[in-house]
Amino acid sequence: MDHTQQSRKAAEAQPSRSKQTRFCDGFKLFLAALSFSYICKALGGVVMKSSITQIERRFDIPSSISGLIDGGFEIGNLLVIVFVSYFGSKLHRPKLIGIGCFIMGIGSILTALPHFFMGYYKYAKENDIGSLGNSTLTCFINQMTSPTGPSPEIVEKGCEKGLKSHMWIYVLMGNMLRGIGETPIVPLGISYLDDFAKEGHTSMHLGTLHTIAMIGPILGFIMSSVFAKIYVDVGYVDLNSVRITPNDARWVGAWWLSFIVNGLLCITSSIPFFFLPKIPKRSQEERKNSVSLHAPKTDEEKKHMTNLTKQEEQDPSNMTGFLRSLRSILTNEIYVIFLILTLLQVSGFIGSFTYLFKFIEQQFGRTASQANFLLGIITIPTMATAMFLGGYIVKKFKLTSVGIAKFVFFTSSVAYAFQFLYFPLLCENKPFAGLTLTYDGMNPVDSHIDVPLSYCNSDCSCDKNQWEPICGENGVTYISPCLAGCKSFRGDKKPNNTEFYDCSCISNSGNNSAHLGECPRYKCKTNYYFYIILQVTVSFFTAMGSPSLILILMKSVQPELKSLAMGFHSLIIRALGGILAPIYYGAFIDRTCIKWSVTSCGKRGACRLYNSRLFGFSYLGLNLALKTPPLFLYVVLIYFTKRKYKRNDNKTLENGRQFTDEGNPDSVNKNGYYCVPYDEQSNETPL
């Protein structure tokens, strides 16, 4: 008899175990698919950031416009983020994420399309390409050439083709579409993950997710490094006819290849989400035997949430309920402080990262390929390790909400302190005759002064808009052979095989020759290696606290409002940080330019040369200005968090058990959505 009853119970238990297994397998598949989508999302972001300088040169636009293009991703995200976050949680979240990944892939491919319609890239005037020895490049006494640029007839003729430069608008549209597609991935993905993870494992899953996502930036940096060394029109022109190198300020790599690869990967990542369930199967009893992830609420919060729940039951997607929910999070003092704090921090991060590669190129004389490779190989693995370590520390020591705030405050303070060490590493301006030095290469000049012609080139009637830099034997770079006073040349138009002679402005122990290309900056090589070490250190401490920031956000609001809170947070961050930060960073950087290119229409194009010192102080100073207020706001955040949870300490719950870790709600189940092993379930409500 007993044996028969045991067999019957075992038979009844088997389907539950099978259902639980399917549930766990579905969660693991979702976690794997979400990780892949995070990789693709991060890959696309790095590809855009690392291509900023090349996009500026290809479309002949200033940094403020390239900042707008970069902010297009956030503009697209901004258009739909709130509605996706609020209404998306009530729909099929995995399928919405899949649709988003597909749209993100289409947007990435659209970004690359202008390359195929713009024609070949012309890095110099057509008549200059034909012959290096013509009168526009070398100095011929009393030649009839305008010193300020080409004639109006030439400008008007070239301006018809110049209309293609407006193709950058399609790059902006593609980036906006990529932002729209990315919208559901973070709020819906993390809320789905939090709903169905095992109890106490949310922080660990988030740390793992962000660590795996670091594969995307690594691939992005390596891929961008490889493609940056490939000429933009590879496959269309004879590469032997290209006389510029990656060290030249006019060089444009195959930036479009990175976007095509990323687009195909994003489309592939969308496929698994269409085969995942809306909600994993679970019994009603499991739903009843679970409690909220959020900490016990005060009586006022309970009453408020009861009213919200009643309204949601009447019409879960009406606008009145949305506005009431929005008001609920905006009256949460912890949430508002956290919102302002992260807005400033993220603005500094987005703005600095957008122009990080330009900073390295201009400050230390490195190519885009070298900057991408080193950052991808060294910095990104360090950040991945720091993110995983940060998530592990929070879980291992079971940090409360106050503890998490203190932990992030510590990591942010250390990273902030190390940033002051960047300033001694700034390099001096490039020795550039006519821009930072007089034309004889002897005396420095202020960058805002229009340097007058010297005795050595005043009779050459040179075109000052001409950009064909040469390196003199005296170590000074000249804008063109004509402005160096060179009378003759020998070579095959290649940088290492072309020499200019009889250069009256060059004086170096009787040797007055020069070769094609800019002079290298050997003095900054040591500073660059110290910069990399410092960058790794700052990145480590910055990344260590990033997973914990998400936990502070989720624990500051009621569980029912998590998706909306994350969505509204993303809305503000993207509107005021993601969109505006690259634009005003770009505007600050444009003010440090001392030599602009001239478009075929005679208008200002991309910057050829920056004042290195002014660039460095503007870039680093703006970073510190945005990251100083958050340190004080962390103190305020800790104070309000302590005050909120102090009144809940050691409160006796309705079932007679005490909640001893109210500041650590991560150790509590969320509405029965967690994958609790069958043999661990009991008749008691798990806390």
Curated annotation (Swiss-Prot):
Protein name, per record: Solute carrier organic anion transporter family member 1B2
Localization, UniProt: Basolateral cell membrane
Cysteines paired by S-S bonds: 456-486, 462-482, 471-505
Primary role: Mediates the Na(+)-independent uptake of organic anions such as taurochlate, bromosulfophthalein and steroid conjugates (estrone 3-sulfate, 17-beta-glucuronosyl estradiol, dehydroepiandrosterone sulfate). Also transports prostaglandin E2 and L-thyroxine (T4). Shows a pH-sensitive substrate specificity which may be ascribed to the protonation state of the binding site and leads to a stimulation of substrate transport in an acidic microenvironment. Hydrogencarbonate/HCO3(-) acts as the probable counteranion that exchanges for organic anions.
Domain of life: Eukaryota
Catalytic activity: estrone 3-sulfate(out) = estrone 3-sulfate(in); taurocholate(out) = taurocholate(in); prostaglandin E2(out) = prostaglandin E2(in); L-thyroxine(out) = L-thyroxine(in)
Expression sites (tissue/organ): Liver specific. Expression is highest in central perivenous hepatocytes and lowest in the periportal region. Isoform 1 predominates. Not detected in heart, brain, kidney, skeletal muscle, lung, testis or spleen.
Cytoplasmic side: 1-28, 89-94, 195-213, 278-328, 395-398, 555-563, 642-687
A Gene Ontology biological process term: response to glucocorticoid
Residues that bear Phosphothreonine: 660
